[in-house]
Amino acid sequence: MIMWGLLLTMILIDFGASLRNVYDMKIECPHSINFGESSVTGKVELPPLLLTDAEALVPESSCNMDNHQSMSIIQKVTKVSWRKKADKAQAAKDSFETTSSEVNLKGTCALSHRMVEESYRNRRSVICYDLSCNSTHCKPTMHMIVPVHSCNMMKSCLVGLGPYRIQIVYERTYCTTGILTEGKCFVPDQSIVNVIKNGVFDIASVSIVCFFIRVKGTNYKIMASIKTATANNCNDTDNKVQGYYLCIVGGNSSPVYAPSTTDFRSMEALASLLRAPHGEDHDLSGEEVATYSIAGQIEGKIPHTANAANMLFTAFSGIPSYSSLSVFIGSQDGPVIYSPGLFPRLNQSSCDKIALPLIWEGYIDLPGYYETVHPCNVFCVLSGPGASCEAFSEGGIFNITSPTCLVSKQNRFRAAEQQVNFVCQRVDQDIVIYCNGQKKTILTKTLVIGQCIYSVTSLFSIMPGVAHSIAIELCVPGFHGWATAALLTTFCFGWILILSITLAVLVVLKFFAAILHNSSQENRFKIILRKIKEEFEKTKGSMVCEVCKYECETGKELKAHNLSCPQSQCPYCFTHCEPTESAFQAHYKVCQATHRFRDDLKKTITPQSTSPGCYRTLNLFRYKSRCYIFTVWVTLLIIESIMWAASASETVLEPSWNDNAHGVGVVPMHTDLELDFSLPSSSKYTYKRKLTSPLNQEQSVDLHIEIESQGISTSVHALGHWFDGRLNLKTSFHCYGACTKYEYPWHTAKCHFERDFEYENNWGCNPADCPGIGTGCTACGLYIDQLKPVGSAYKLITVRYSRKVCVQFGEENLCKTIDMNDCFVTRHVKVCIIGTVSKFSQGDTLVFLGPMEGGGLIFKDWCTSTCQFGDPGDIMSPKDKGFSCPDFTGHFRKKCNFATTPVCEYDGNMVSGYKKVMATIDSFQSFNTSSIHYTDERIEWKDPDGMLKDHLNILVTKDIDFENLGENPCKVGLQTSSIEGAWGSGVGFTLTCQISLTECSRFLTSIKACDMAICYGAQSVTLIRGQNTVKVSGKGGHSGSSFKCCHGTDCSQQGLQASAPHLDKVNGIVEQESEKVYDDGAPQCGISCWFVKSGEWITGIFNGNWIVIVVLVFFFILSLILLSLLCPIRKHKRS
């Protein structure tokens, strides 16, 4: 048993170790496969291995896409390593030496000519690795290049490299074909001409990975191009290495070949490679702070059979951070150099003893354009206790959130469309969704209606058509549905309800009447007792027994006490008691006969004669009388019909301001008409009245004021792109020579700072192998790597809040866009924006961490000149300027211990500004945008959330010359074209109207959607001469409503009926489009209006499903038959 237990323990330990060796490689794919030989790439950094194990690595793939066959071929490389000389006890410039040998590797990223192109055509992958080594260990970096078609074929697969397992995860981005950078989809442009046209294209920093391809030919003399780019003194370029770099831009592009004079991407890639030949480091997490011990510069032989040393290296020991694979340029073949523990010299300022990187990674700035962000369509269906929703967009969905739903990460793609499915657990409140910068609202009331209709129809499935028609009315939310249920129940079985309810009411009334009767008799008896007692006390004295001290009510009771109590007997039950007051009192509490004398007195009192009262009347009421039942039945039907029709009214818009002019449709102009209110930035406002003369009501003029939603226009200064990065602290120690003698890889980083402690070593700060004190250098290097663009920043120069105001006063039609503290003045009307409550101010910085359609953050303390690492805006790439690096304000300290290598310490901040902002993002003000338009100098948008408010004042003067104002000559023709949506539901309906305008060129007015009795929605519109298409949205109505397009009191001849309120899919509505307030002072629906609505409903039923009427009449007749059987006519006998 012990052996089995040990074996099981070893298996579990081995299984846990294998789980720890699984790493993820993410490959980002566009969701629309474009034409051309596009490839996608991914990489993953792996933990270090022993040198001998690393040299035996072979990539293995279990993916259903075969790896390119040439990757399994043995690759001969020249291995150059260094070691200490045996005859040297202390370090010096000649105390170490290099050795060169040939080793065989499999699967390194020494790609052959046309390999990637063949892999694309043959649907194969290219899996290879890079090595970053010191003298004892290597860190592998696995790269994978696959055709873009693999994104459709695979979601994930497993690749092996030595002891490691790499899970390849294909992740679809919301980009159609572009590259995801800064949260936006960027499409690079390769034309050089477009770079010259400033402002035509955007500039973005895009990641790039390049692989050197060795191939001979006159067209592949790469050193000649490098000589031109660097102006070095290399003359013998024909005998140098020949080949080119194959690059993939942004992890998703067709191959970019460098050098090339026709592709700007190629030119930028080669320039960046020459500027920083070591590229990005390969530090793992936690290796930001590391120590190198530099042995010094040394030469080696390439290839190993060379007669003399021809390649320059820098020997080091410590954590390997940069690639150990390079290409020797000294011959046309370009031997691959494998140099563990050695930095190859990659600086191309000279021609001798240098190499080119085999694999290079970095960032390049490219011109291009960002993909258009399309609005989302969202719909939901009822699913169980909640709702199942789906959002889709023509392009992609860059951001979707909801405060009321659980938005999943599951995406589906159909061609260029992206779909996101999610679940909302509650439908008792409206579903709010933010998608692609738009606020969508799903009115869940309609979902509940649909479930109700389904349930009622299923319950009466024997007659589904009739049940469906009745369910449509029953399931309307609110009072209308209950009124429908009451009306149908009363019509069919009203007599049962009348009898039952009347009987219940009578029982309750008789119960209370009996209680009141008994209570009055008891009160009369108590009054008599009180009078007897008072008379006895006046004539004979106290009624308190002298023995037991009990207060009696009658004389007989007192006489019994005087006889029994002295004899130790109870005067009521004659039980023996102790002759003490306490004993008697205790007995009286349990005695059952204490009421004996009271009952005798009640019998002697003559009861009061009662006349026929309420109780008797209730007992005689004939509630089963057919006359009573019929009268109540008809009355209830009339009242319920009126209440039913009245309940199908429109949804009243509640303004979010206090209007001090409680206007009506007609306003006599005795005084000036003034409105003063605050209006949310996302709201539109329409005010319409008919102004009449105070002297003659026949003289009038129409007033129509339209105020659009607020527009925000800003003048900005584009600060450029904001970057995130990782700060590294590296210590480089060498025993001899000045610090300036050596080049470190971080010298080519865009942002770096170095502090040198030169010739400062002492005996307490010296490794054992150094020759003495004051001979060497400790270089403390700070540099930023893994740079990644995260957003764009704009400095606010001016902010302008404006609204478009249009006024139709009689024939006069004028419009103007007014700003804050500005007025629009006509002869009779004055509209002013008095002030604006805003969160923006001049000097603020707007930062967009993604598409501008998704909104941004407001920074009050954005640094622009002297920036420290960790400040907002610390790492910037201004447009048309060089890279802007932050200041490192901390102090360096060299920490020493006896006989150990010195270590640099830095007391400054090590966290980037972006990471700090994301950790405290809730403390920053944010804003959403809608209908945004932007350039480098201006940004214009509208606020969809209504977070800002304008204080508005409207003044209409009373000095109107009604006599000289003629009638408006504009003639409006109305025709109803189509209808969408449902009546009586939360979603409502949309009526399409064809409006013709004659006799004038422009006319600002409103078109309403009405049935015969009431209007349910209106749209303010500026008509132009000729035909106009106007869509009017409304909510309300009933199954008999025939909706028409109306202008004032005139309506179209034909009306259309909307669908029943139970759509299978409920579409989301754009919040900003629905936020409008319409005020025309129209009168409310009165009693006559209610009867019209009832008649329209009944007419609609006859014109629609008349089978419902037949069924209802059948149940009505059946109900009458039951009434005649259960409540027969009472027969009276003749006397």
Swiss-Prot record:
Question: Membrane among the record's keywords?
Answer: yes
Q: Where is this region: Fusion loop?
A: 757-777
Q: Which GO terms describe its biological process?
A: endocytosis involved in viral entry into host cell; fusion of virus membrane with host endosome membrane; signal transduction; symbiont-mediated activation of host autophagy; symbiont-mediated suppression of host cytoplasmic pattern recognition receptor signaling pathway via inhibition of MAVS activity; symbiont-mediated suppression of host TRAF-mediated signal transduction; virion attachment to host cell
Q: Which residues lie on this side of the membrane: Lumenal?
A: 19-495, 649-1105
Alphabetical list of Pfam families matching this protein: Hanta_Gc_C (PF20682), Hanta_Gc_N (PF01561), Hanta_Gn-B (PF20679), Hanta_Gn-H (PF01567), ITAM_Cys-rich (PF10538)
Give yes or no: UniProt keyword Cell cycle.
no
Which domain of life does the protein's organism represent? Viruses
User: Phosphotyrosine: which positions carry it?
Assistant: 615, 628
Region listing for Binding to the ribonucleoprotein, in residue ranges:
516-533, 588-605, 592-603, 611-625, 1122-1135
Q: Which residues are glycosylated?
A: 134, 235, 347, 399, 928
Q: Which segments does the record annotate as CCHC-type zinc fingers? A: 545-565, 570-591
Family recorded in the similarity comment: Belongs to the hantavirus envelope glycoprotein family.
Q: What is this protein called?
A: Envelopment polyprotein
Origin species = Dobrava-Belgrade orthohantavirus (DOBV)
Taxonomic lineage is: Viruses, Riboviria, Orthornavirae, Negarnaviricota, Polyploviricotina
